[in-house]
Curated annotation (Swiss-Prot):
GO terms for biological process: calcium-dependent activation of synaptic vesicle fusion; defecation; locomotory behavior; necroptotic process; regulation of calcium ion-dependent exocytosis; regulation of nematode pharyngeal pumping; regulation of neurotransmitter secretion; regulation of synaptic vesicle exocytosis. It comes from the Eukaryota. It comes from Caenorhabditis elegans. Its cofactor is Ca(2+). This is Synaptotagmin-1.
Amino acid sequence: MVKLDFSSQDEENDEDLTKEFVRDEAPMEETTSEAVKQIATTTKETLKDVVVNKVIDVKDVVKEKVMQQTGMPEWAFVFLGFVFILLVLACAFCLIRKLFGKKRHGEKNKKGGLKGFFGKGQDVVDGKNIQGMAQDLEELGDAMEQNEKEQAEEKEEVKLGRIQYKLDYDFQQGQLTVTVIQAEDLPGMDMSGTSDPYVKLYLLPEKKKKVETKVHRKTLNPVFNETFIFKVAFNEITAKTLVFAIYDFDRFSKHDQIGQVLIPLGKIDLGAVIEEWKDIAPPPDDKEAEKSLGDICFSLRYVPTAGKLTVVILEAKNLKKMDVGGLSDPYVKIVLMQGGKRLKKKKTSIKKCTLNPYYNESFSFEVPFEQIQKVSLMITVMDYDKLGSNDAIGRCLLGCNGTGAELRHWMDMLASPRRPIAQWHTLGPVEEEGDKKDDKK
């Protein structure tokens, strides 16, 4: 009997089947994983698209509702958003500068001078603070330039010294007692470096009474101790200004004015004795004073329903000297004009021997409402002369031919009907030869 042994053959067959199964199983696993990944990716993309579409839909719905409620176009929302972003950035910049700027300035002050900028501190070495350092350097440069300018101005400013005086007003007697006590640190006006100072006193605006101290030879610190009395009523003293004019005496030429001190008596307490020092100010510029013609104050009022234009000449000040004695006899001439033709002319009273006349005189002109924009008003300050012709000092031109402050005054009057509008004006030159002279009053 023959026995057949199939064990080894079966084992070999099993091994072959196992190998084939393993070879077939590997591709199956790879295919499955790839499919799973593809499904996951597709799902994510689909979900992302859905979410984005939903967000866009919600945004569109909100935008439409807001636009319907506010009535604003789309570009307006874009503009407002841009402005909001700019405001946020500006606030952030200011906050950062406020927080860190103080710290830098504090450190600079502690270290002193320029050391805080160019020392070995961490704020300079750290690259993050380079921009802040550059900004501080720029500010420092500007501050240094400003300091240099101020120092240059201080060097150019000449010290004229100061003067000590005493004021005492007697209300019962109506008199002002002025004592010139002393002066010190006066500038040297002579070749030797000294001066021969004296003080001239008078009251503005009249300059009628002038008094002088004695001359003190070759000194920059004179002691005067001289007293003078001015008769001034109490109802007039508040409009006066006391002048201390300091001069250097010269025997053979014109005396040079060192400087002056002005005391407005309306701004001090006359009920008490005043004794104080005052710095001496530079003297007035004679050339500029000669060019100035003065100022005039008047009010304008127009009533459209009545067609009535009212001009009130109030006062004038600092008028140009026209007479030999250094004064003038001023009056004011008002001329209503249209198309170069004079419609009506009126004049104030004459104020004798003054450069600061007070009038408070009213004049009326009939001007219909349809003509008010076509007329001009020429206000001229004249100097009365008893023997010769009256000369013009200066004038203002208002109305349709006016310019600058005169035109603004006229427009303010028209914008405020029935209400008087008062204003000061600087007198301009009278260019027309025919207006420089006037007939007798």
